[in-house]
Amino acid sequence: MLTAAYRAEVASRNMKYQESEETNSAIKKMADALTTKSHKTGIVLCGTCGNGKTTLVRALQNLLIYLKYRNLTENGMPIMDAREVANRMRECKTVPLLAIEDMGKEPTTKLDYGNILNPVIEVLEHRYNEQLFTVISTNLTAKEIKEKYGTRIADRFNEMMSVIIFTGKSFRR
């Protein structure tokens, strides 16, 4: 079903689905992460630009809507750019399912009435503590995540996230 949702997402962008071993592997890994009984409470999709991470996140969102998981949140699973997470921090902490798109693009800190906040870190820590399912896409490597967000977040990622690394070439031409 996830493969069909991925193909439909590609078609919705007026693109032609290009079957590849890398894409099939990523879809299978995500399906396994979603259906295998595990202590993991999230999935992180890592890789360079344009190789299908966002398409897979949107395919999952559309599949959840199709399967009637709409009652969990307004649209199954909100997908928010990491910068939007910084602005909607309170909401992002509590939704049952959340996808954070392009983690790493946002400024690490934000000034709020004189207080320095680290919104993405705060959201991730809260979701970790509450064991709320989170899907993340990023162009950052594990080392870069550790440098930007700190050892604690990197360590929690290792515990809470199933990691899917996208190795394929960019589909954007």
What is the meaning of each model-derived region?
Residues L45:
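Hydrophobic anchor at the beta1->P-loop junction of P-loop NTPases
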Residues S38-H39, C92-T94, N129-Q131:
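Short loop/turn elements that form and flank the Walker-type P-loop nucleotide-binding site
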Residues L56, L60:
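Hydrophobic positions on the alpha1 helix immediately C-terminal to the Walker A/P-loop
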Residues G50-K53:
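Conserved glycine(s) of the Walker
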Residues N62-E106:
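AAA+/P-loop NTPase substrate/partner-engagement loops
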Residues M1-H39, V163-G168, R172-R173:
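A short, basic N-terminal segment
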Residues G42:
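Walker A (P-loop) ATP-phosphate-binding motif of ABC ATPase nucleotide-binding domains
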